[in-house]
Amino acid sequence: MSIERPSCLHRTPMIWAVGFTCLMAAEPLWAQPAAPAGKVQVLSFDIPAGDLSQVLLSIVRQSRTPISFDQARVQGLAGPAIKGSLSVDQALEQALRGSGLGFSRNASGVLTLHTVASQAPQPTTSTPATSAGTLATVVVTGTRQADVKATDSLSPIDVVSNEQLRQTGTQNVREALIKLLPSLSRQAQAYNASALTNAQSLRGLSPNHVLVLVNGKRRHETANINVSGGLQSGSTGVDLDTIPMAAIDHIEVLRDGASAQYGSDAIAGVINIILRTADQGGLVSYNAGQYGAGDGFSQGGAVNNGYRVGETGYLNLSAEFREQKSTIRAGIDERTGHYGNPSIGDPAVHRQALAFNTGAALTDQLDFYSFATYTHRTVSSAQIYQLPTLVPTIYPNGFTPRITSDEDDYSLTAGLRGVELFGDWDWDLSSTYGADKPDIGMDHSVNLALYNETGTTPRKFDLAEYKATQWTNNLDLRRAFDVALLPKPLNFSWGLEQRSDLYKVGAGDYYSYYNGGSKALPGQAPATAGQWTRDVLGGYLDLSTHLTEQWQVATAARYEHYSDFGSTTNGKLSTRYDFNPQVGLRASVSSGFRAPSLAQENYTSLGVSPTIATGLLAANSAAAKMLGAEDLKPEKSINYNLGLVLNPLSDLNIAIDAYQITLRDRIVDGGTYSGQQAIDALRAGGISVPAGLASVSTHYMTNGADTRTHGVDITATYLTRLDGWGQIDWRLGANFNRTKLLKNHIGSDGRPLLNDQQQAWITSSTPRSQVSLEANWSRDKWGLTVRETRYSKTISELDYYTGPNAYSTTEFNHFENSPKYLTDIELRYSATRQLSLAVGANNVFDVKPDKLPAESAYLGFNHYDTYASQISFNGAFYYVNAVYSF
């Protein structure tokens, strides 16, 4: 991989001939194009009889037509031989004859199996959302072939269905995924405005190191950077909560480096969210729940419906709402001797979301497609309680400032997809625009300096307007070549991508930053506001084939040019050898790249508590360079993956994947300074620091570390049939993960950039092991899911707030949070064929993290380690759920 400084620092964005004003069709990924819906094509089939699932996959391979089906629906069914000259529909009709299954085709040619009510045999046991079934799903992530199952992939891929998401008892996509996939984690709680956004980590790395796609198209990042400390500090990852769960068909999580395939950010892996494409039917759902402590009541509802549009079109619509009240998990405030400081807990959230996925065939060889999401979210996050003595004439009983966010998040993709371009090329031309726009405010606060000067102060402030946008244009082409010496076709893909990124910080109102600003969090001053842009041009090549019937290989290369960093070239080589149907070995090696986000380069802030102020200086600012900061550089990575895939029994699937990720020039929270040096730097950066604080410190984002993360992922599924007592779908998931600090970079003043606390955030704030065992039992109308998860200990280096080391930035309190076990239970009942009811409990035994030692519990009330990525401190959560399908 090479980085070259560009001769020109700006390149005008490419203008693509894609001007769409109508709704269009969607498909999981361009690389799986089928013949357009309006075209009838006769093909030659030669498929032997066997399991129906294998017959269906053979139809996919020989016709290059995607077929979406749940393995659980075809489990145990036999498929006939399919031979002769037939259309795809005729072949599928033969395969499904007598099975009780039918099929429908959407506008982009994707075929979906469904039960034919009049023919379907009545099962003696109900069908659960089996993990074994999802393993047989044809996947579209990490491959550009049309017939790859999760169990046959060259890299480890988890497939999570919408039903599995719902059965976690949460309407938050991030929280649902974390419950189901041990390789995903999140920090316990963020502070200040960072608490307003959800983020997730994969394999113990930063949220910045996982790429999120929707239907295979790059998703924009949040505009709200996390600056509250911990592993996720400095991250601007994708907020999955902005995508309505009702719109999701399934989610594919690729646990392997994929920068050579998808570009920047895909260092730890890729999360690809596949939207629903049904042209009929739908559901209405409602869920409600509350924590065992009696707070945090939440409720939500969703509607999804599919419509046929004309002869070949479809429109799938989703709408969703959710409201969540705040929680309080604080200890006794040593200043008052009472409980109730609300700053330790979840914020209050109100959220409304919409999504559509639509399309139609224009001609026999041309399709339109389009999909979009829109989310409006308001959040209110309580900050530290302020004493009555501060402003007695305004708040005689004291006050609790609340940071607020009024956020709009939206994304629209539109494209054209066709076949037989210049002969046999399948092609896809698309444009995606996405934006996140949170307006941050402060309520129930004061400007103390203004109050002392004039005797009056506003109580409500506009702190800042943030905006992050991303406009991505793609041209992708694919063709399969028959090569004489190869047993299967050579799949050749190539494409171009142009992307324009923008990050904007708008100043707050005058009194939000005047002379120290609003209490808890001052607003952005004009000196720290601004707008920054970046343009990216890239191209890729992708080859895959079978060298023998058992040995498949794939290689990819990608070149990208950044207007502000120069050029990068990354590659990936993957291979898999199946010794027999029961044993397979897979491996990959790849290089990766991640450019620093525009927010990491340019964001400045100051957080103020009753006794402490902590600032963040923009890494590229003159103020940060006073302290020795340097311009941020791209992060570079090398990934290795070695996996063993075992299918010893027809109902048992096991995958063991060992991995290593080496990161150079990792962007971390470092370069910490305190006292007058920090105050001078903050003032130079346009930040006014309040007087009378016990401690003032500041830091900046920096390429401060080289790290190596290595570990093992284990997944296993097994189906137990209990004759007349139903069946149990077992799922085991485990992640063993460790990150080592290879190099702590040295600052210009000769000091290491990372102190002990910041090193611990990277190396030990995430559990080194997380193991989950799930049993999903079903019989007739009843279903029961029990999930047990073990989290190993986490280690943090905590601040001292009392004693001789109080507020030190060099001496820390070593703290170990012991291993924890969480138990989740859900009981389901199908009242009718359409109505399903559920009641459940997450963390049924009300397990919480260990409490902090008194000397590190800020003012007594902050008695949990909010930097750890282990378990939530909210405790048991009880819920009910109802789904009506039609």
Predicted regions and their residues:
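Short, acidic, small-residue-rich periplasmic hinge/interaction motif at the N-terminus
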Residues: 56-62, 114-166
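Extracytoplasmic beta-strand/coil segments of soluble accessory domains associated
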Residues: 111-114, 146-147, 157, 177-223
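N-terminal periplasmic accessory domains that precede
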Residues: 111-114, 173-176, 180, 200-201, ...
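Short acidic/polar hinge/loop motifs at secondary-structure boundaries
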Residues: 217-255
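Transmembrane beta-barrel wall of Gram-negative outer-membrane proteins
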Residues: 280-283, 293-383, 388-397, 401-414, ...
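Outer-membrane beta-barrel transmembrane domain signature of Gram-negative proteins
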Residues: 399-413, 420-422, 433, 445-553, ...
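Gram-negative outer-membrane beta-barrel transporters
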Residues: 653, 658-800
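C-terminal beta-signal and adjacent terminal beta-strands/loops
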Residues: 663, 738, 788-802, 829-886
